[in-house]
Amino acid sequence: MEMIKKEEGNKDGPSVDKTTPTEIPPAPTDSAGVAAMMKAWQEFATPGPEHAWMAESAGTWVCDSVKQWMDPSQPPSTASATDVVTMTMNGLYQVTDFSSTMMGMPMQGHGMMGYDKMKKKFVLSWVDNMGSGIVRMEGDYDKSTKTLSMAGKQSDPGRNMETDIRQELKFHDDGTYTMSMYGTGHDGKSEQKFMEGTFRRKK
């Protein structure tokens, strides 16, 4: 199977990327190989320390004032928000149900985050009623700063293309966490913060 990419300025269509590995090794058929493969899959499906860390966030979180910037030169709008976090599928995935308002309209979001033990990355998918696309991000947790940083792409219908998106979750010693969201700025080059809020557990 060949991996292809479309080169800039190539009007004849996609070209083969010769630098990308093109062969997938066959699955083992001998008993030892099959046993090793099954063991690898069992390990892949077993929650690890990263999943236990995600489970610590299970519960209901609230924010009195989520800031939202449509125009960075103007003051942000604010809205309250609620985040309900649960674990599912034997503790492999963290499910988030988010509710707030955006631009005066009710906003509902649904996220699923896991830790891919093969990639050794946190992986996230996100959907909400503000659009029909699925946002996918992945990233790492920095224990020294207590920050989970994830980045990916989102559909931008205004530009008719995918643009960068980035999320930071910074966990504080008082048990709260701050969520910050960043995207491509109006100039198409710089990064712009478009959402930020500090959440606390609902008592």
Show the residue positions of the predicted features:
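Intrinsically disordered, low-complexity sequence elements enriched in Ser/Thr/Gly/Pro
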Residues: 3, 9, 16, 130-134, ...
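Residue-level detector of short, conserved catalytic/binding motifs and their immediate flanks
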Residues: 59, 111, 197
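Solvent-exposed loop and beta-edge segments used for protein-protein assembly and interaction
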Residues: 53-57, 88-90, 173
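Edge beta-strand at a domain terminus
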Residues: 3, 171, 181-203
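Exposed beta-strand face motif in extracellular beta-rich ectodomains
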Residues: 175-177
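Central antiparallel beta-sheet cores of small beta-barrel/beta-sandwich binding domains
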Residues: 63-166
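Amphipathic/hydrophobic helical signal segments and adjacent flexible N-terminal regions
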Residues: 1-75, 202-203
